Every structure is written in structure tokens, then in C-alpha cells.
From Swiss-Prot:
Protein's name according to its UniProt entry: Phosphatidylinositol/phosphatidylcholine transfer protein SFH11
Family annotation (CDD domains): SEC14
Basic and acidic residues composition bias: residue spans: 1-20
One BP term from GO: protein transport
Membrane topology of the entry: Peripheral membrane protein
Family, per entry: Belongs to the SFH family.
């Protein structure tokens, strides 16, 4: 029986334009100022795109975004993420991919990287013999760091526009409730927690293909672990999925096992190739120049701001004025606190002098009691 029903639909929309709207861009600047005022803006990982992701994660609520961002920075320190990114070696990479086929492969029509998993071909027992959940999580973190620092910037340069999210395809042929064992649940929940809390807003859309009736029961369980924003990006398809994929991806960028034309035979298969703009030597050289992406982004945002409606510009001005007033008030409060501290010190010293004089006078006139200053 052919499955053509879809549990959840997503709209094509214009997410990239929404991300770059003047209101959102000014909110990023306000968020940066808020973190700076409290001494929470780090030298690393506090870039424009990261701040915007955490704002979107919390619907542009500054205080909630700040809390989420500070949790992220604490996690990076506690989990030693920078060390994992630089030093962790996943020697079992090839063996793991045999039992859990997955990987990045080229880009979609919008220039976003494509990530693919063939869950129906996963052999969990063999996977757990090849590695541990802890080591795989470290590998996943290292891959996420590579995506943030290399894949997205490379795709941005190649497509000449800002790219900060991924198009994902999950092939669930043959997957059902029996696949959702305790180890599978542990791995899924750990990966989901990391991605949703520390790498938010990096999913553009998710195609679940070859979904059978048996997958529906599993999907009901999986949905409980996903937030509404993620669910809105998911499209569950049966075996007649190809038309939907080809609307988003060129056949030359789609592996043959999904109905496309690509085999990556020189790399042992598409999921072993990691093929994409991030392997272009010229693009990688540009990424090493810190100004490249930021300059392109600033130029784009200048154009967006110039074309903003008058009412939007007024509201943006109000946001910035509010932040400036907040900053001025914060400075005034700190200055007042310092003055109060100085007055308290001066008053304390004055009372010490008066008490000393009282003792001298009492020594000179022992028969006349003198009341000393009470301690502060």
C-alpha cells in the first residue's frame, strides 16, 4: 500500500528574508548591548548570527534569550566544546557510517547544505559495538561546530547570501516502533537536547521519506520530544516523495538512492563524500579572512534597512532609544552606588575621629561622662 498522507506540512515561506528584517536586526544589536552591559558578551561565539539564533529561539524576548545564551556558554565550558572541536578524533568514523549511514551531501536550490540519514539501514547493535553513545555525541558536537564555522560560511559565499540552516532528509524505510529501543531513545534524546538547546534555529526543513504505516506509531512518540517550531518545519512523506524533494533539490545534488543522479563513486558513496562548497579551496581561503562574511552581511543589512517602511524605522528607533536609556540608567545607578560607598567610608572615618576625641576629653575630665558615637 502506498503511503501518501503527510502528518505535518511546511510552507516554503521566505525565512531568510524574515531573518534579515530590519526589526530583527535591530533586536540583535539590542541583545548585544544587553549582554555587553552585564559583562556577558564573549570574545568568541558572540557573533551576529549566533545572537540572532538565540533571539529567534526565544521569540526575540531579550531576557529569555539572554538566559538561553548564558546556558549555552556555560555548556561550552563545562563540556569542553572547543577542545572537542579541535582535538577529538573519531577513529571509528568509517565503521560507524556502515552501520548508521548519514552525512552531509551538497546543497539544495537555496544554497543550504543537505544532511541525510538512512535510518532504515541502521544496525544499532553493530553501531554500539563500533562506538559508544558518549563518543558519538562528541563526534556529533564536532560536526555541528564544523557546520557553524565552515559549512554555513562556505554556503553563504557560494550562494552570495546568508546561509545559517540545513535541509535534512531522513529515509525511514522499514522503521517502526521496534527500532525505538532504549539505547536508540537515549541517543535520540541526547542529540535532540544538544541541538535544540545549543544549536537552535539551524533546521530549515526536514523531509521524512518512505514513511510506512508502522512509522506512524513511532512518529507519535518522537513528536513529544520536538518543540512546535521544529515540528512546523517537518514534512512526513510516503514512498511517493520524489516530486517534493525535486522542488527543493536539483537531481544532480540528490543521491540515486533517493531518486537523484549523484553517486559520488569516487568517495565510496554520497554519504561518505561530505561533498559541498565547504571543500572548495578558494572558498575555504576566503573563510579564513574574518571580514569576508561580516562585510557581505553588513552590506546586505544596509540595503534591507534602507528599504524598510517608515513605521518600522520608527519602531526600531524606539527600541534603540529604550536601550540607550537603560544603559544610561545603569551607569547612573553604578555611579550613585560608588558615591554612597565613598560617603559611608567617610562617615565611618569621621566617627572614629570623634570617638577618639571623646576618649581624650574623658581622660582629661574623668568625672564627666561623655557619650560616644554609636557604631554604624
Amino acid at each position: 500500500m502506498q503511503e501518501t498522507d503527510r502528518d505535518i506540512h511546511i510552507s516554503d515561506g521566505t525565512m531568510n528574508k524574515e531573518e534579515q528584517s530590519p526589526n530583527n536586526e535591530e533586536m540583535v544589536e539590542a541583545f548585544r548591548n544587553l549582554l555587553l552591559l552585564h559583562g556577558h558578551l564573549p570574545d568568541k561565539h558572540g557573533d551576529h548570527n549566533t545572537l540572532r539564533r538565540f533571539l529567534k529561539m526565544r521569540d526575540f524576548d531579550l531576557e529569555k534569550s539572554k538566559e538561553a545564551f548564558l546556558n549555552y556558554m556555560k555548556w561550552r565550558v563545562d563540556y569542553k566544546v572547543d577542545l572537542i572541536s579541535q582535538k577529538f578524533k573519531f577513529e571509528e568514523y568509517g565503521e560507524v557510517k556502515k552501520h548508521y549511514p548519514h552525512g552531509f551531501h551538497k546543497v539544495d536550490k537555496t544554497g543550504r547544505p543537505i544532511y541525510i540519514e538512512r535510518l532504515g539501514m541502521t544496525d544499532l547493535n553493530a553501531f554500539l559495538k563500533a562506538t559508544t553513545i558518549e563518543r558519538y555525541v562528541n563526534y556529533h558536537i564536532k560536526e555541528q561546530e564544523k557546520t557553524m564555522s565552515l559549512r554555513y560560511p562556505a554556503c553563504s559565499i557560494a550562494s552570495d547570501k546568508h546561509v545559517s540552516s540545513t535541509t535534512t532528509i531522513l529515509d525511514v524505510s522499514g522503521v517502526g516502533m521496534s527500532n525505538f529501543s532504549k539505547p536508540a531513545r537515549s541517543l535520540f534524546m541526547e542529540i535532540q537536547k544538544i541541538d535544540s538547546n545549543y544549536y537552535p534555529e539551524t533546521l530549515h526543513r526536514l523531509f521524512v521519506v518512505n514513511a510506512s504505516s508502522g512509522f506512524r506509531m513511532l512518529w507519535l512518540a518522537l513528536k513529544t520530544f520536538l518543540d512546535a517550531r521544529t515540528l512546523a518545519k517537518v514534512q512526513v512523506l510516503g514512498p511517493n516523495y520524489l516530486g517534493e524533494l525535486l522542488e527543493a533539490i536539483e537531481p544532480s545534488n540528490l543521491p540515486t538512492f533517493l531518486g537523484g543522479n549523484c553517486t559520488c563513486s569516487d568517495h565510496g558513496g554520497c554519504l561518505f563524500s561530505d561533498e559541498g562548497p565547504w571543500n572548495d579551496p578558494g572558498i575555504k581561503e576566503k573563510i579564513e579572512e574574518p571580514s569576508t562574511i561580516e562585510d557581505a552581511h553588513s552590506e546586505t543589512m544596509d540595503k534591507v534597512s534602507e528599504n524598510a517602511p517608515a513605521n518600522q524605522k520608527e519602531s526600531l528607533g524606539e527600541v534603540m532609544i529604550t536601550m540607550e536609556k537603560y544603559a544610561a540608567l545603569k551607569t547612573a545607578v553604578k555611579d550613585s552606588q560608588k558615591r554612597i560607598e565613598m560617603l559611608e567610608i567617610s562617615l565611618h572615618e569621621t566617627k572614629k575621629v570623634l570617638n577618639g576625641l571623646a576618649e581624650i576629653i574623658e581622660a582629661i575630665q574623668p568625672n564627666q561622662p561623655i557619650t560616644k558615637c554609636k557604631p554604624v
